[in-house]
Amino acid sequence: MTPNAIRWEVPPLTTTSVEAAIHYRDGIAALVAGIASADQQLLAATTIDPGFLLAHIGRAVADATGGAPYVPPPTSSSLVTRGERQHAEIVAVTLCGDVHRARDLRREHLLEFPGDLLIVWLPMLARPGGG
C-alpha cells in the first residue's frame, strides 16, 4: 500500500473560491490547534464567499470557544451538500447538548468523511473544560 492509497475524505465544499477554501481549511486547523488567528481566517473565508456555510459554522464555533452561545447560521438546503448539512447538524446538536444524538450522527458522518477535522475535534469542545 502506498502512502497516497489512504485518503481522508472531507465533505465537498460549496464554494467556488479557492482562496475562501484555503482560508477555511487554515482557519479550522488553527481553531482545533488553539491558535488565535482562527477567527481571522474564517472571517476572510466568509468575506470572500458570503454563502460559504461551513466557514460560517466555523466562525460560530470559534465564537463558542470564546464563551459565546452557539448560534447556527441559516442554511439554504438547495445550495449545500448532504455532507455539509450533516456537518451543520452535528455541530448544532453537539453544542446544544444532545450528546448521545451527536455521537450517533458524528459516527455516521465520519464513516464517509473521516477527514472532517472540525467534527473529529468537536467532542473536545463539548466536554466540560474542553473549550
Predicted regions and their residues:
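Alpha-helical segment of the N-proximal tetratricopeptide repeat
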Residues: 16-44, 48, 85-104, 122
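Asp-box/WD-like beta-propeller blade repeats and closely related beta-sheet repeat scaffolds
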Residues: 103-107, 111, 115-127
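Alpha-helical junction/boundary sensor with strong preference for TPR arrays
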Residues: 31, 48-49, 78-81, 112-113, ...
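Alpha-helical repeat scaffolds
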Residues: 42-43, 69-82, 99-110
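Residue-level recognition of tetratricopeptide repeat
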Residues: 19, 50-55, 82, 113-119
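Specific register positions within alpha-helical solenoid repeats of the TPR/Sel1-like families, i.e.
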Residues: 29-32, 57-65, 94-95, 127-128
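TPR-adjacent "capping" and linker segments in tetratricopeptide-repeat scaffold/adaptor proteins
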Residues: 2-22, 74-85
